[in-house]
Every structure is written in structure tokens, then in C-alpha cells.
Amino acid sequence: MCIRDRCIAAVSVGDGSAVVMKYKYKTYVVGCGGNYFSGSAVCDIINTLGSSNIDYIILPEDSEKSLSGVRRVKETYRISSAVTATDRIKDGFSFDSVVSLNGNSAEITDGKLKITVQDSRVYVSFGDSLSEISFGDVNDGSDAGLLICRGLTGYEKSDIILVSTDKTDIGDLPSQKVILTSQNGTVLFTLSHNGKMTYRRMA
């Protein structure tokens, strides 16, 4: 999840879970987008660290509960910024046609973009930058798991944004939609636990 103490993104899929990250001297609390009631993981983390030590709360937007959770946490704890995925990409992107890679081992080169799927992980090379997008362990066979997005090299040249958690197109297992941007372009990825993925380059 971290390389040399630098985290790009880590997002909990499990309901009620949360992850703490530090990146470029900022502290981020990333929640699952559920209902952040008193005593939930996000609130416990805030109480433990102290609100003055947290710079951002980031919550994927997947339900009305998520939106109400953002407002309550922000108002109660006076965090400097609480954002959802659509805050980052509300104007949207225009993408080319979908390209699919199935199975646990595949590789494709598309101009300066090189994608390798191996053991349910996706390695994305954009020139000097290399990023990994993957799921962590699924707890007890449930849908709860950890999506890990990290810059392996050239981390300062790339940006990874969680778009949504989705269960619609890959059976009962969750999939994740992620936008990755570097100096060579922008790509939207959809990744599942079983190694299937699609990507769309920005038009």
C-alpha cells in the first residue's frame, strides 16, 4: 500500500471500514462510503488521531448514506476537506471505446500506455511512471476487501482517483472503477477480484 512511506490511494470496500494514509505531509482518512454513525471506523479514527491532525476525509459516493455521512463528519469534526469521487470528476471525461483483458495473465501496449494483468493485479506503465492497481484479501469470502492503488516509481507524475465501487458487471464480486492520469494520458479502469478488467483511454 505504501512505497517509502508515500501512499497514492487506498480505499476500503467493506462497509464501515476505513484506511489512514499519509502522502506529501498530508493525512487522509479514506472511508467505504457507508453510513458514518457514531462509533464507526471513520469516527473512531478521527477521535483517536484528533481532528486537527487530519487534512482530508475521502469517501466514495455510492449511496445517499455516503453523502449524509460526508456532511455529518465534516460538520462535527471540522475537517479541512471532505470529498467524494464526483467532486473530483464532476465535469466528466470523454473516453474512447472499451478494451477488455480477461484472466490472470495478459499484456497490452497502446502507444505509451502499457498494461500488464498478473495474479489479479494490474500494472500500468505511463512512460516514467509505474502504478499498481489491485484488490487485497477478501475477508471470510465476503465482498469486503481492499483496493490498493500505488505509484511504484515516478509517483509524483501520476494521479489515481477512485470513481466508484460497482457490483453490476462481474457477478457477485465487487469491481472498482479507477481513473489514472499521468503526463502521457488519462485512462479509466474497471478491475474485478478475478483479474478481469477493462480500460478506456481518454478521447
Identify the role of each PLM range.
Residues 4-203:
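Non-globular, low-confidence helical/coil segments that flank catalytic cores
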